[in-house]
Amino acid sequence: MQVLVGIVHVAAFFLGVFIVATTVMSAIKTFVLPRAANVRISRLVFVVVRVILDRIAPPSRAYADRDRVFAMQAPFSLIGLPGCWLLLIVVGFMLMYVGLGESPREAFITSGSSLLTLGFDKPPRFASISLSFIEAAIGLGLVALLISYLPTIYAAFSRRETPVAMLEALAGTPPSASSLLSRHHRIGGLERLDDLWITWRLWFADIEESHTSIAALIFFRSPDPDRSWITAAGCILDSASIYASCLDVPKSADCQLCIRGGYVALQRIADFFSYPYNRNPKPDDPISIDRSEFDDLWKELEEAGLPLRSDRDQAWRDFSGWRVNYDPVLLFLAGITAAPIAPWSSDRGWRYKPPPLLVTLGLRKPPQHPAT
């Protein structure tokens, strides 16, 4: 019997070590590691918060109501992350104290007292006292880590929102590709669009870096309820795709590089949620935009006096070939962020469906080629 008890204590101790080590690594990968990382705990927190808010404000509610609720998604997620980490730290050290011979009740009290630095419980053994010091240091470190990264988070948010706010003057509210191109044509600015493509290519590179290393930024909503970083991204990508495929203008390398930089950035952000999409789509794969919508856009551009190519059918094929690269991830990110309604992005009726738990925890790979 004593042998069995000893085995249980050893197993409990090493299970606690595993939980604590996993939790600490999760915190480091989430806030310190300067690259995208597959952090299961963080992804689970974001998905759970998203599901809860979706129950509070379902898609059937008015957008203004949903916007007020989802404005709290990022703050709740940021608060939920350290809360989840601290809970796991308590459980992990509790198991280690059990492994050192304390009863579960005593282990829980010791672990909670040490983590919160309350100091009302003194462990009976030197090994337990040493563990309590380590636990207190870890608890303070996790809280300090979150606080120290808040300025970094808000600096990245400010960089993201400046071009989004400026886009309203170019593309209207909600932003649309037809408005952006027509307005530039009226003021004689089509030949100066290369500057816009360069600006937004840099913007896409910035959000790829910031929104994959600090995933909470994905859910930070714009100060204006009618603006969204993802609908702005969709407007720019559609504008560049239409410019490259429909307008009778010289080819622009900056335009094409903007499209590629844009869809690569959105794909990297979608990867955080293990969203399945075809990484190598064919140009003729289906997209969420149908031919009649494209024809309506063509007529708008024609009435605005933009120089259009003579072959509309080929222009449609070229546009589809560009759009297919970012269509699924654009709709996914617009859905998961509950973005305001905007043409050809958040107006497609896409609804968020939480992935299976095993996929969320990274224990099973998602399918790679979903239907579009």
Name each model feature, range by range.
Residues L196, I218-R221, P225-T372:
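Soluble C-terminal extramembrane regulatory/interaction domains of multi-pass membrane proteins
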Residues G16-T23, L78-T162, D238:
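Pore domain of cation channels
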Residues T162-A233, D238-S239, D248:
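Non-transmembrane accessory domains of multi-pass membrane transporters/channels
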Residues H9, V69-G92, G101, P225-A233:
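Transmembrane alpha-helical segments and their cytosolic interface motifs
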Residues F31-S60, R159-P175:
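Membrane-interface amphipathic/juxtamembrane segments adjacent to transmembrane helices
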Residues V8-R40:
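Transmembrane alpha-helix/interfacial motif
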Residues I41-I56, F108-L115, G119, S130, ...:
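Hydrophobic alpha-helical segments of integral membrane proteins
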Residues L4, P58-S77:
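Cytosolic juxtamembrane amphipathic/interface segments immediately preceding
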